[in-house]
Amino acid sequence: MELIPSFSLETWVLLAISLVLLYLYGTYSHGLFKKLGVSGPRPLPYFGNVLSYRKGVCEFDEECFKKYGKMWGVFEGKQPLLVITDPDVIKTVLVKECYSVFTNRRVFGPMGIMKNAVSVAEDEQWKRIRTLLSPTFTSGKLKDMFPIIGKYGDVLVRNLRKEAEKGKSVNMKDIFGAYSMDVITSTSFGVNIDSLGNPQDPFVENAKKLLRFNILDPFLLSVVLFPFLVPIFEVLNITMFPKSAVDFLTKSVKRIKESRLKDNQKPRVDFLQLMINSQNSKETDNHKALSDQELMAQSVIFIFAGYETTSNTLSFLLYILATHPDVQQKLQEEIDATFPNKAPPTYDVLAQMEYLDMVVNETLRMFPIAVRLDRLCKKDVEIHGVSIPKGTAVTVPIFVLHRDPQLWPEPEEFRPERFSKKNKDSINPYVYLPFGTGPRNCIGMRFAIMNMKLAIVRVLQNFSFKPCKETQIPLKINSQGLIRPEKPIFLKVVLRDETISGA
């Protein structure tokens, strides 16, 4: 008994009350789904179901889908997530009730200047920024930017040839990460970099700092488990994005903008210039124009949204081609017929390539960019007989939808024919969501697809890809954040002939 402290009765009572209060604080929201009649895995106090993500969010979602069916409830800390897979419910959330109820994405923590980014901004600010940015992503503007991207397609081919000539296997992420970084820094900041050849460039170093993201990161966990800390972090200027990187990039945008405004030469067409033009347009009311902070936030978010997504998808696609030589050959035949003698790709013709489109779409089905997407419920609402309280995050498990055998027969098989002209009209648009859908879908979708297609055409004009001893077969994925390979994808790169176009 000597091991037990000799506290007074009052002290023991206070300790007991404190423990009960701590337990209640860590669990007070955890009875929500039981009240609503929605099943789901049992949450832990404070953590909810977050610790189950250690094996991967995809794996966790697939287990829940098999066990609970089309709808289930989970908790990230005390935050309730209603996970939905029914296409009609998805349509209501992402499209029909987007403006009235499900306008905003869930914000995970203190954002600083990045709260002005189009993918983070809320309600009226989001609508205004989205309206101002939308003309930037029209086919006409993308066509104007195509020569900039084409230039980096040539750099990509040169870099790949250097690696192929070494006779060693090539890390796809190194090659396509450099291409992705070059295109984004060029179109968002007007900066020309060969990032593979200049990895120490401050733009490259700071851009990569933005991209170190893990769902089990201690800082991210702290704001998920203790959301009351977010305002404190904001006051202390501690944000989800590395301050040094954001400061460097925002100062660079400011400097480049000032330089362009002083320069009387005709500026080139890129995202940065188009945003500057929108600020100075007489057609835009001054109170509606992008502020300088908003302009800077968009430039930075383009890096965050575009680098990993493009480079990972291209890496996955080349892995698929290497392990499906029949698909690779058929795609090369289409490319050779469309652009004879390795002619440079053009914007309009690239968009019309049917088999290329099928291969890209099927790659994005098997390896979607994001594991999930979500919307925050702004008010109590009932949808298709389900009551959703205000503050609940409604989540769509994209990976689960894209691998559902009832929607996609033999979903683990790579079949571009699913997206042929004959078949794609039968696909429900609310079960294929690589870029989301509705008013808040990915604003850069067409840019991303154009960017990827150009890279694919340029490399397949000049090279073929084969598995090597370092290639992980079957490929395993890591889903603690974006979907990426568990191990780097290494492939053998073979010159198709001795002539290299654009290099």
Curated annotation (Swiss-Prot):
Topological relation to the membrane, as annotated: Peripheral membrane protein
PROSITE patterns noted in UniProt: CYTOCHROME_P450 (PS00086)
Localization per Swiss-Prot or TrEMBL: Endoplasmic reticulum membrane; Microsome membrane
EC number of the protein: 1.14.14.1
Broad class of where this protein is predominantly found: endoplasmic reticulum
Biological processes per GO annotation: oxidative demethylation; steroid metabolic process
Cofactor(s) the record lists: heme
Domain of life: Eukaryota
Induction / repression: P450 can be induced to high levels in liver and other tissues by various foreign compounds, including drugs, pesticides, and carcinogens.
Similarity remark: Belongs to the cytochrome P450 family.
Record-given protein name: Cytochrome P450 3A24
Gene that encodes the chain: CYP3A24
